[in-house]
Design a protein with these regions (language model features):
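Short alpha-helix
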Residues: 215-239
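A short, conserved alpha-helix within the catalytic core of class I
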Residues: 132-137, 161-174
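Core SAM-dependent methyltransferase catalytic element
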Residues: 238, 245-271
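Short SAM/SAH-binding signature in class I
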Residues: 145-159
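Rossmann-like AdoMet
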Residues: 1-127, 131-145, 262
Length: 271
């Protein structure tokens, strides 16, 4: 997740990465995080399930990429590498798969380094995903990834922090241009396009409830998400609701929640 430059290690201050960990049933969260998460869930009861849909999409898209021969991953705005994250899925299929987690937020980086200690093929890097030139020059990225080979780029829940004034299409192009042909980019995004009126009100109340923890959340429709994949070939079924993107036995989570309609997901191939 991308967060404000003022973020710090104060355990009394709710933290976006730890809140997300709490939604996923992880153990790396504190009372302040759980308290804010409870407030957020009170205005959007489907928030926890939405987080689980997002993680389910990440797991399925990583599995898909490994099946296509991808052996190295860049997970942007990753938060904490817990609860069935990229390295766990990739390395279960290919023990030699390499993963670089990137987050700007120092809490996520500090905890992530502890979690990944002892794993020679996974590292945590402190960098801002909105600055790809700096990110790709980071020694942690350069030391782990071979940018001349195809790469799996994970952008699950990242572009929701990038407003139109920050040129999200241009940002996606910057990543696409660095990726070797045969690379894949997975992206998920918050939406209220298919929500009923009551749920739309809840979504915008949730956006307000997150203020003070993050800078801003942005909601996009399907056309807005499709535009982010300009210049790439969308993998079937294209842009779809998160739980509907290529469900796989053992990697799915139940549907039926109002949150089913609150996130789009897609994977694009770099040709």
């Amino acid at each position: 997740m991308l967060v404000s430059e003022t973020a710090h290690l104060d355990p009394e201050t709710p933290n976006i990465s730890r809140i997300y960990d709490y939604y996923l049933g992880g153990a790396f969260n504190l009372p302040a995080d759980r308290e804010r998460a409870t407030v957020i869930k009170s205005v959007l009861p489907g928030m926890e399930m939405l987080a689980r849909f997002n993680r389910g999409f990440l797991r399925r898209s990583v599995a898909f990429m490994v099946d296509q021969g991808i052996t190295q991953f860049l997970d942007l705005g990753s938060g904490l590498p817990t609860a069935g994250n990229t390295h766990e899925v990739a390395q279960a299929r290919d023990p030699h798969a390499k993963v670089v987690y990137v987050d700007y937020e120092p809490v996520a980086v500090a905890l992530g380094e502890q979690i990944l200690r002892g794993n020679p093929n996974a590292v945590m890097v402190e960098a801002d995903a909105r600055r790809p030139d700096e990110l790709f020059g980071h020694p942690g990225v350069r030391g782990m990834l071979d940018l001349d080979r195809p790469l799996g780029v994970m952008m699950t829940g990242v572009m929701v922090f990038v407003g139109d004034h920050e040129d999200p299409v241009g940002l996606m192009k910057a990543y696409r241009d660095v990726c070797a042909p045969g690379s894949y980019i997975a992206l998920s995004h918050l939406t209220d396009e298919r929500a009923d009126p009551e749920t739309k009100v809840q979504v915008h109340a949730m956006v307000e409830a997150y203020k003070g923890v993050i800078e801003q959340l942005y909601v996009r429709d399907r056309a807005g998400v499709e535009a982010l994949f300009d210049g790439m070939t969308l993998v079937e079924p294209g842009v779809t609701l998160m739980p509907e993107w290529n469900p796989r036995p053992g990697l799915d989570i139940p549907t039926g929640s109002p949150a089913h309609h609150l996130g789009y997901a897609a994977v694009g191939r770099v040709d």
